[in-house]
C-alpha cells in the first residue's frame, strides 16, 4: 500500500486517480499507446538511417521496457487528507509509474513537515499541519470582533453603557475611563456597582433602573455566550461550520490560542463574554459621542477606524493569498496526476524519456516543498506574535487588531513568494533568495518614493473622512468673483439680467406655473440619418372571404416588330397504294383475255392466267430519280425589304416485283385445237392491263434545308375596344400572427424645434372662467372630480385658443398645395377615337387592294371540288355497269367450269381404275388369292 499525503482535496484527488486508472485500462489507451510506440519506432528508424548507432536501438529497447513496467505494473494507493483524517480514500490499479513518485514525494514532504513541527512544538491551534496558516492568530483577530447576535442584548447594552456606565464614570466617579480601558475584566467592573436611580427603557418601553438592568444583562450574556447561545452558535458555525464537532473545536482552539499568545487560562465562553462586553462598550461610547456632537471624539474615532480599515484592506491581499495557495497546491497536484498518460506518451520516444521523467519528478518535489515552507513561515509568525503580545483590554483592542493585521499581511505576502522560492530551492537556492530579496526591496522602495514625491510637491491630503453623516472642519479656498451684472425681477415674476457687455439674459422660470396638466404648442424641423439592422421571424395565418364585380373602360394601341430565322432536317418514309377509276376497266380487260385464252385452248382460267403471266416479264426492276431547284425573290408591298430563297432536293425509288409459281398435277387429257389467232391479242391485252393495274411504291427520302432571311415588317393596326365594368367588393379578413424580432438600430438626427409652453395662459384661463375654484383646479391632484373638471377645461382651452391657430395654418397650407404642379391634359372623346380608327382602317383596305390580295379563293375551291366529285361519280357508275357485265360472264364461266370439272373427275376415276387393273385378275386381292391356290396345288 502506497500512502499519498495531501493538504486538502483528498476526495477530488481520489477521483483523479480513479479516472487515470480506469482510462489506462481501456482499449482506447491501448490504441493510443500503440500509435505512440509506432511513431517512436519510426523515429528510431530515422535515427538509425542517419547515424547507424546501435546505442539508439538499445536505448529504445530500454525505454520500452521501462515504460512497460511503469504502465503495466499496478498497485494500490491510499490518500491521507490532513484536513479530514476521518475519511479513508483508497484507489486500486494505479500504474506504478504514477503511484511511486507521488507516494515518495508526498511522504518525504509530510515527514519533513511533521519532523519540523515535532521539534518546534506548538499547540494545535497554531500548528500548520493541524489547522493551517496562522489559524490561532486569525482566531484571536476574529474573537476581538465578537458582537452579540441577540437583538434584546444589543439594544439594552448600548443604552446601559450610555446611561449607566458613562454616568458612573463622569457623574459618580465610581471608576475612571482609564480604569475601564485598562481593565482585563470589564465585565465585572461595569456590573459591580450599578446606579439604583438612573435607568433605561426596555423593549416594552418600561423604565428599569441600572441595577435591575445589570442583572438582566448578566443573565442574558451568560446564556448567550455559552454552548447553545445565539452568539456562540453564530460564531461557531462561521468558523467551524463544516466540521462534525464544531462546539468542541471552538472551545479547545480558542482557549489554546489565548493561552499560547497571552498566557490566559480563561475558557472559550469567558473569552467570548469578555470580548462581547468590550465591543458593546466601544459601540456605546461611540454612539454617545455622536449623540452629544463631540466633534473631537468623532475625529479621533474616525482616525482610528480609518487606520484599521487601511490595515485590513492591506491585509486582505495576504489573507486571499494564504487561503488560495494551499488550494492551488492541491489543484496543481491533481493536474500533475491527470497529465500522467500524456507524459507516458511523450516518454515513449527515447530522446525525450529522461527529460520528461526528470521534469515530472522535479514538479512533484516542487509541490511538496510548499507545505514545509508554509510550516516554517507559520512557526516564525506565531513566535513573533507571542513575543510581541499585548494584553487584550479595551485600550489595546485596536493595537491588537493592528498587530495581527501586520502579521497576516506579512505572512500572506511571504506566502506569495513560496512557489517561486520552492522552485529555486530545487534548481538553485542562492538565486532564489536573491530574487525574493529583490522583489521585497522594490516593493518597499516604491511606496517610499511615492510618499517622498508627494512631500516635495506639497500635495497633502489628510483627514478626508465622514463619520455617521457628520462633516467637520470643512475649508474651501475657492475664489468666486462676480461684478458688472444688473439683475431685476419683472412684474410677471421672471428675472432679467444685464451682463457686463450689455446683453440681456431672460429667465422666465419664475413666471411659469408648474401644473398637473401641461399644454404645449410645438413646431419642429428635423433631419435624421438612421442605420438599422433587423432580423425577424414571422408566422401568420389569414382567412379571406370576398366578392367583387367591376366596370372598366379601355382603349389600346399596339405596335409590333418580329424577326425569325432557322434551319431544318427531315427524313421521310412511306408506302403508297393507288387505285383509280381506270383500274376497274383494266381488271375487266384482264378477265376477258384470260377467258378468251382458256376457251381457245380448252384450259382452265387458272392455267390460262399462268400461261399469260409467263408470257409477260416475270421479273422487273425500275429506278426513278428526280431533282429540282427552286428560287424565289420577293419584295414587300407595305414596307421596305426583300428575300431570296433556294431549295434543292433529290429523290430515288426502286420498284420491284417477282412472280414465281409451282404446280404439280397428274391427269390425262386429249385435246385438239387449231385456233391460234387470238393468242397474241389475249397476251397483249393481259400484259397492258397487268402493267396498268399493278402499281405499288415504297419510297424513302431525306432532305436538309438551311435558310437565312432578313425581313422587315411594318404593321399598322387599329383597334377599338369598348368595355364597361362595375366593381363592388366586400372583404372579411382575419389575420393571426406570431412574430419574434431582434433589432439593432443606430439613429443620428438633427432637429430644430420651436416650443411654446401654454401652461401660464391656461392658468389665466382658469382664473377667468372659474375664479372661485382656481386653486383647487390648478393644484389638487388627489380628487378624481377635480381632475375630470381640469381635463374638461384644458380641452376647452385647446379648442378656443390653440385649435383655431392650427386650423388657420392648415387652410393656408392647403391653398398652396398643387400650385407648382402642371395640369393633366384630358383625352379626346369617343368620336375622335372612332374617326381615327376608321381612317387607319381605310389605309389598310387600300393597301390590300393594291397588293392584289384575293378574297374569293374559297368560292373557287368549292366549285372545283363540286366538279371533281361529279366526274368521279359518273366514272363510278360506269365502272359499276361494267362490273355487272363481268360478274355475269364470271357466273357463266363458273358454271361451265364446274361442269367441265365434274366430267374431268369422272374421266380421271375411270382412267385410274384402268391403270390399277392387273392382267389375270380384277384386283390385287383376287390375284393374291389365285396365287395362293396355285401354291397349294403344287
Curated annotation (Swiss-Prot):
Biased composition (Basic and acidic residues): 923-938
Membrane topology (UniProt): Multi-pass membrane protein
Chain segments annotated as transmembrane: 54-73, 330-350, 413-433
Name of the protein this chain belongs to: Protein TraG
Role noted for this protein: Plays a crucial role in donor-recipient cell interactions. Required for two stages of the conjugation process: pilus biosynthesis and mating aggregate stabilization. May interact with TraN.
Keywords of this entry: Cell inner membrane, Cell membrane, Conjugation, Membrane, Plasmid, Transmembrane, Transmembrane helix
Modification after translation: TraG* probably arises from the post-translational cleavage of TraG.
Cellular component terms (Gene Ontology): plasma membrane
Ranges facing Cytoplasmic side: 1-53, 351-412
Organism expressing this protein natively: Escherichia coli (strain K12)
Keyword Cell inner membrane listed: yes
Gene symbol of the encoding locus: traG
Sequence ranges on the Periplasmic membrane side: 74-329, 434-938
Region (Disordered): 654-677, 915-938
InterPro entries, A to Z: TraG_N_Proteobacteria
Subcellular location: Cell inner membrane
Amino acid at each position: 500500500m502506497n500512502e499519498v499525503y495531501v493538504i486538502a482535496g483528498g476526495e477530488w484527488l481520489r477521483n483523479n486517480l480513479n479516472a487515470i486508472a480506469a482510462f489506462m485500462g481501456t482499449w482506447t489507451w491501448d490504441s493510443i499507446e500503440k500509435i505512440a510506440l509506432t511513431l517512436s519506432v519510426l523515429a528510431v528508424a530515422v535515427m538509425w538511417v542517419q547515424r547507424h548507432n546501435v546505442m539508439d536501438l538499445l536505448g529504445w529497447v530500454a525505454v520500452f521496457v521501462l515504460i512497460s513496467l511503469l504502465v503495466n505494473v499496478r498497485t494500490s494507493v491510499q490518500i491521507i487528507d490532513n484536513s479530514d483524517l476521518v475519511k479513508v480514500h483508497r484507489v486500486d490499479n494505479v500504474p506504478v509509474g504514477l503511484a511511486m513518485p507521488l507516494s515518495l514525494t508526498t511522504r518525504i514532504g509530510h515527514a519533513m513537515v511533521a519532523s519540523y513541527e515535532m521539534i518546534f512544538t506548538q499547540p494545535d491551534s497554531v500548528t500548520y499541519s493541524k489547522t493551517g496558516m496562522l489559524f490561532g492568530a486569525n482566531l484571536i483577530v476574529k474573537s476581538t470582533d465578537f458582537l452579540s447576535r441577540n437583538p434584546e442584548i444589543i439594544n439594552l447594552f448600548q443604552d446601559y453603557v450610555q446611561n449607566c456606565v458613562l454616568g458612573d464614570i463622569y457623574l459618580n466617579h465610581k471608576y475612571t475611563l482609564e480604569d475601564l480601558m485598562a481593565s482585563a475584566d470589564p465585565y465585572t467592573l461595569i456590573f459591580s456597582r450599578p446606579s439604583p436611580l438612573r435607568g433605561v427603557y426596555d423593549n416594552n418601553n418600561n423604565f428599569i433602573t441600572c441595577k435591575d438592568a445589570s442583572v438582566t444583562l448578566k443573565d442574558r450574556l451568560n446564556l448567550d455566550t455559552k454552548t447553545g447561545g445565539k452568539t456562540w452558535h453564530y460564531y461557531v458555525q462561521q468558523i467551524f461550520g463544516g466540521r462534525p464537532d464544531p462546539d468542541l473545536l471552538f472551545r479547545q482552539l480558542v482557549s489554546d490560542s489565548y493561552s499560547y499568545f497571552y498566557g490566559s487560562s480563561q475558557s472559550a465562553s469567558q473569552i467570548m463574554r469578555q470580548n462581547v462586553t468590550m465591543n458593546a462598550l466601544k459601540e456605546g461610547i461611540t454612539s454617545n459621542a455622536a449623540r452629544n456632537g463631540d466633534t473631537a471624539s468623532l475625529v479621533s474615532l474616525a482616525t482610528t477606524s480609518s487606520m484599521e480599515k487601511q490595515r485590513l484592506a492591506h491585509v486582505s491581499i495576504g489573507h486571499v493569498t494564504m487561503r488560495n495557495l494551499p488550494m492551488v497546491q492541491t489543484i496543481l497536484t491533481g493536474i500533475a496526476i491527470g497529465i500522467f498518460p500524456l507524459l507516458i506518451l511523450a516518454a515513449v520516444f527515447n530522446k525525450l524519456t529522461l527529460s520528461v521523467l526528470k521534469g515530472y519528478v522535479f514538479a512533484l518535489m516542487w509541490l511538496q516543498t510548499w507545505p514545509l515552507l508554509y510550516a516554517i513561515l507559520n512557526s516564525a509568525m506565531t513566535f513573533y506574535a507571542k513575543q510581541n503580545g499585548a494584553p487584550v483590554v479595551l485600550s489595546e483592542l485596536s493595537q491588537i487588531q493592528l498587530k495581527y493585521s501586520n502579521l497576516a499581511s506579512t505572512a500572506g505576502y511571504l506566502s506569495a513568494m513560496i512557489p517561486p522560492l520552492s522552485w529555486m530551492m530545487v534548481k538553485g537556492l542562492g538565486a532564489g533568495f536573491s530574487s525574493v530579496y529583490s522583489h521585497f526591496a522594490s516593493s518597499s522602495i516604491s511606496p517610499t518614493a511615492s510618499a517622498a514625491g508627494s512631500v516635495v510637491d506639497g500635495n497633502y491630503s489628510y483627514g478626508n473622512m465622514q463619520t455617521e453623516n457628520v462633516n467637520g472642519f470643512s475649508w474651501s479656498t475657492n475664489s468666486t468673483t462676480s461684478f458688472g451684472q444688473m439683475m431685476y425681477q419683472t412684474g410677471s415674476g421672471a428675472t432679467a439680467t444685464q451682463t457686463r457687455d450689455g446683453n440681456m439674459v431672460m429667465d422666465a422660470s419664475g413666471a411659469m406655473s408648474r401644473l398637473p396638466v401641461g399644454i404645449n404648442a410645438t413646431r419642429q424641423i428635423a433631419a435624421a440619418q438612421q442605420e438599422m439592422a433587423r432580423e425577424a421571424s414571422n408566422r401568420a395565418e389569414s382567412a379571406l372571404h370576398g366578392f367583387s364585380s367591376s366596370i372598366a373602360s379601355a382603349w389600346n394601341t399596339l405596335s409590333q416588330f418580329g424577326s425569325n430565322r432557322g434551319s431544318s432536317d427531315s427524313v421521310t418514309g412511306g408506302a403508297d397504294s393507288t387505285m383509280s377509276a381506270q383500274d376497274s376497266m383494266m381488271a375487266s380487260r384482264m378477265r376477258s383475255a384470260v377467258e378468251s385464252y382458256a376457251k381457245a385452248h380448252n384450259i382452265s382460267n387458272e392455267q390460262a392466267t399462268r400461261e399469260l403471266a409467263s408470257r409477260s416479264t416475270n421479273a422487273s426492276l425500275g429506278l426513278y430519280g428526280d431533282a429540282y431547284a427552286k428560287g424565289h425573290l420577293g419584295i414587300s408591298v407595305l414596307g421596305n425589304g426583300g428575300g431570296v430563297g433556294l431549295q434543292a432536293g433529290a429523290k430515288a425509288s426502286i420498284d420491284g416485283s417477282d412472280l414465281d409459281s409451282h404446280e404439280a398435277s397428274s391427269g390425262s387429257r386429249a385435246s385438239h385445237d387449231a385456233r391460234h389467232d387470238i393468242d397474241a391479242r389475249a397476251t397483249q391485252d393481259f400484259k397492258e392491263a397487268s402493267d396498268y393495274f399493278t402499281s405499288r411504291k415504297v419510297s424513302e427520302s431525306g432532305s436538309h434545308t438551311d435558310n437565312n432571311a432578313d425581313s422587315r415588317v411594318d404593321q399598322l393596326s387599329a383597334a377599338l375596344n369598348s368595355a364597361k365594368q362595375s366593381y363592388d367588393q366586400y372583404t372579411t379578413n382575419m389575420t393571426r400572427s406570431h412574430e419574434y424580432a431582434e433589432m439593432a438600430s443606430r439613429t443620428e438626427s438633427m432637429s430644430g424645434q420651436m416650443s411654446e409652453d401654454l401652461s401660464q395662459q391656461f392658468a389665466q384661463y382658469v382664473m377667468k372662467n372659474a375664479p372661485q375654484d382656481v386653486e383647487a383646479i390648478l393644484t389638487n391632484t388627489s380628487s378624481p372630480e377635480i381632475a375630470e373638471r381640469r381635463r374638461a377645461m384644458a380641452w376647452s382651452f385647446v379648442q378656443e385658443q390653440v385649435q383655431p391657430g392650427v386650423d388657420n395654418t392648415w387652410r393656408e397650407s392647403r391653398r398652396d398645395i398643387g400650385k407648382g404642379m402642371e395640369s393633366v391634359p384630358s383625352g379626346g372623346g369617343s368620336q375622335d377615337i372612332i374617326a381615327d380608327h376608321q381612317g387607319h382602317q381605310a389605309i389598310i383596305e387600300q393597301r390590300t387592294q393594291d397588293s392584289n390580295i384575293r378574297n374569293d379563293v374559297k368560292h373557287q375551291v368549292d366549285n372545283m371540288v363540286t366538279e371533281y366529285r361529279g366526274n368521279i361519280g359518273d366514272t363510278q357508275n360506269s365502272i359499276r355497269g361494267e362490273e355487272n357485265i363481268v360478274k355475269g360472264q364470271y357466273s357463266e364461266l363458273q358454271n361451265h367450269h364446274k361442269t367441265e370439272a365434274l366430267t374431268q373427275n369422272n374421266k380421271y376415276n375411270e382412267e385410274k381404275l384402268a391403270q390399277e387393273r392387273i392382267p389375270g385378275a380384277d384386283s390385287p386381292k383376287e390375284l393374291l388369292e389365285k396365287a395362293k391356290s396355285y401354291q397349294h396345288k403344287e
